[in-house]
Swiss-Prot record:
HAMAP family: UPF0128. It holds the Pfam family UPF0128. It comes from the Archaea. Belongs to the UPF0128 family. This is UPF0128 protein MJ1463. InterPro entries: UPF0128.
Length: 233
């Protein structure tokens, strides 16, 4: 029986899945909001007391301003979350575009939306600020889950798991640890050996929950995982 190149590629590409629904919501601390570039404000919108966000260090107590047809007044720039509230963020999809939505949730379960911005824009700014270059290079698209994808060298017949060198196995183990923490993931990985210069030849696609990468600790673990396969520029 003749096996064509497409079948060889499909049969030998390794797939590792942590099944379940991609995490849509995650709890964050106020410091995370600041890491994303925002201050949490207690103030007034059109005369009604509420909470909202402004760009980091952009406003101070007593400031008044207009935005999108609404009147804002800053009463206090908060340095901690309001008493008996928690900060949650989730991803919403609208016409194929992902938005990160942040809400304050009180002890009665009432939500107050304080931020809604395009997830890809904020995530990229967050990654750049923290110099997570491997993720920036690998990220391809953002929804409720995001895709990281990279290729180095030309293809061929992928090696079986038993044939993989230590560097490839370390990459898989590290990715699986990240997925265990995020609760969802799908890694497809084809490893073809090494280039004539001794660098790894591979192709991979890795799905993870978008909201998880707004957690700096998880983002750093993803960055380190991608760095295992790093090749010289």
């Amino acid at each position: 029986m003749v096996v064509d190149a497409k079948e060889v590629e499909m049969i030998n590409t390794l797939v590792f899945e942590t099944l379940g629904n991609p995490e849509k919501e995650r709890e964050f601390k106020l410091k995370s909001l600041k890491r994303w570039g925002f201050d949490l404000i207690f103030g007034k919108v059109d005369g009604k007391e509420t909470y909202f966000t402004v760009e980091l260090d952009e406003r101070k107590a007593g400031d008044k301003f207009s935005k999108d047809g609404k009147e804002y007044e800053v009463i206090e720039v908060l340095q901690e979350l309001p008493k008996n509230t928690e900060l949650y963020a989730h991803i919403e999809m609208e016409m194929g575009k992902a938005y990160i939505v942040c809400q304050l949730r009180d002890e009665d379960g009432k939500n107050t939306e304080v931020l809604r911005v395009p997830a890809a824009t904020l995530l990229l700014a967050f990654l750049k600020k923290n110099k997570l270059a491997n993720i920036i290079k690998a990220i391809k698209n953002v929804g409720i889950s995001l895709e990281l994808s990279m290729q180095n060298g030309v293809g061929g017949k992928p090696l079986s798991y038993e044939e993989l060198p230590n560097v490839a196995r370390r990459f898989i183990r590290s990715a699986r640890k990240v997925e265990k923490e995020t609760g969802f993931g799908r890694l497809s990985f084809a490893y073809y050996g090494e280039t004539k210069d001794g660098e790894p030849r591979y192709r991979f696609s890795w799905l993870l929950p978008t909201i998880a990468l707004f957690d700096l600790d998880i983002a750093k673990k993803v960055e380190q995982t991608l760095g295992i396969l790093k090749v010289s520029e």
